[in-house]
Amino acid sequence: MTSQTLLAFDFGTKRIGAAVGQSITCTANILNTIPAKEGIPNWDTIEALLKEWQPDTVIVGLPLNMDGTENELCRRAKKFGNRIHGRFRVPVEMFDERLTTREAKELAWEEGHKGNYANDPVDSIAARLILESWWRQHPPTP
């Protein structure tokens, strides 16, 4: 089996969570949360992550409504994914991320998080969950 490295992003207008993982174990590790202004990150930070991890594919969470319809944040997340692809020529896939932030908050709470998400964000935990969910739907082939 060929090992693949994937980088996942949980897009947000104030913060963008990041996680990296590899296909041999289908697990992911959180990376530092990336500050954003109106959904625009410091592109040098994104570039540094891409250079460090050299992912085969980037997964960007798509924050669909519970009924599966798209919203304004979906449009912005797609724009973010398109910019990554356009700037860095890496394949990008959008992936349904419904309820990952809620699950990330629950996991953080179980580990003692005090609920102050502005000072202690869970966006990168959500990115890890996005990547792990992606692997459950796209298991590697031997």
Curated annotation (Swiss-Prot):
<keyword id="KW-0378">Hydrolase</keyword>
<dbReference type="InterPro" id="IPR005227">
    <property type="entry name" value="YqgF"/>
</dbReference>
<keyword id="KW-0540">Nuclease</keyword>
<dbReference type="InterPro" id="IPR037027">
    <property type="entry name" value="YqgF/RNaseH-like_dom_sf"/>
</dbReference>
<keyword id="KW-0690">Ribosome biogenesis</keyword>
<dbReference type="GO" id="GO:0005829">
    <property type="term" value="C:cytosol"/>
</dbReference>
<dbReference type="InterPro" id="IPR012337">
    <property type="entry name" value="RNaseH-like_sf"/>
</dbReference>
<comment type="similarity">
    <text>Belongs to the YqgF nuclease family.</text>
</comment>
<keyword id="KW-0963">Cytoplasm</keyword>
<dbReference type="Pfam" id="PF03652">
    <property type="entry name" value="RuvX"/>
</dbReference>
<dbReference type="InterPro" id="IPR006641">
    <property type="entry name" value="YqgF/RNaseH-like_dom"/>
</dbReference>
<protein>
    <recommendedName>
        <fullName>Putative pre-16S rRNA nuclease</fullName>
        <ecNumber>3.1.-.-</ecNumber>
    </recommendedName>
</protein>
<comment type="function">
    <text>Could be a nuclease involved in processing of the 5'-end of pre-16S rRNA.</text>
</comment>
<dbReference type="GO" id="GO:0004518">
    <property type="term" value="F:nuclease activity"/>
</dbReference>
<dbReference type="GO" id="GO:0000967">
    <property type="term" value="P:rRNA 5'-end processing"/>
</dbReference>
